[in-house]
């Protein structure tokens, strides 16, 4: 059975901070998902704001899902840094009924101002390292629409290889097996990631104060 870590944990890399998806993030997330291009790229359906709040709650309560909002560190400032610096989200799902140690990865960089800066790559790598260390994941998958060339290129550069193609959904499935060498590399990456814990409901408190744990 998968056990959840404390939800009030944020992961800070060189260019991004991954913070838990909270209710305060929903209005901006909902605004992003009015973009038809993002809906197509993520294979999502448009939701009302009320439905978006319900979805956020269900995601945070699902023991087989981890969802983090990606913050662009260039914009982390002020009391609402965890909202103002929002640039996308990154998720892993343990939804393989035959093997709970297989996780599907998703990444979205929604803000045009933050694209082309390597934030997607860093976010995925941190999330994979998190999954290997805390959830004992031994294989990652990614399902990407064939027209989403940017995501396909990103995951292939990270070492994912095509395992199947759905002509019906026009979707490519990629896989990344965590070998011993890859595990060591991912865990080493975590040496450069700062884990913040925050006692309040505002991740900005710990980010701006420098509160962190090893």
Q: Where in this protein do the model-derived segments appear?
A:
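Conserved GNAT acetyl-CoA-binding A-motif
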Residues: 102, 131-145
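Conserved beta-strand-loop-alpha-helix junction that forms the acyl-donor binding cleft
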Residues: 110, 141-152
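Conserved acetyl-CoA-binding loop-helix of GNAT-fold acetyltransferases
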Residues: 116-130, 149-157
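Residue-level detector of family-conserved "landmark" positions at structurally sensitive sites
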Residues: 124, 141-142, 165
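GNAT-family acyltransferases
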Residues: 1-114, 134, 161-214
């Amino acid at each position: 059975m998968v056990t959840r870590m404390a939800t009030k944990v944020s992961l800070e890399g060189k260019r991004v901070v991954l913070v838990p998806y909270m209710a305060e993030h929903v209005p901006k997330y909902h605004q992003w998902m009015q973009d038809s291009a993002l809906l197509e790229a993520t294979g999502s359906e448009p939701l009302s704001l009320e439905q978006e709040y319900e979805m956020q709650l269900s995601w945070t309560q699902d023991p087989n899902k981890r969802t983090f909002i990606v913050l662009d560190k260039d914009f982390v400032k002020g009391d609402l840094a965890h909202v103002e610096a929002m640039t996308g989200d990154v998720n892993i799902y343990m939804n393989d009924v035959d093997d709970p140690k297989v996780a599907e990865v998703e990444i979205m960089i929604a803000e045009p101002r933050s694209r082309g800066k390597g934030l997607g790559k860093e976010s995925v790598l941190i999330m994979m390292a998190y999954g290997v260390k805390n959830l004992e994941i031994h294989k990652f998958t990614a399902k990407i629409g064939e027209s989403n060339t940017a995501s396909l290129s990103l995951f292939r550069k990270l070492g994912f290889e095509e395992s199947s193609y759905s002509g019906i959904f026009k979707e490519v499935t990629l896989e990344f097996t965590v070998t011993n060498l890859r595990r060591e590399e991912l865990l080493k990456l975590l040496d450069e990631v700062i884990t913040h814990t925050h006692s309040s409901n505002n991740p900005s408190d710990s980010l701006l104060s420098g509160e962190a744990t090893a």
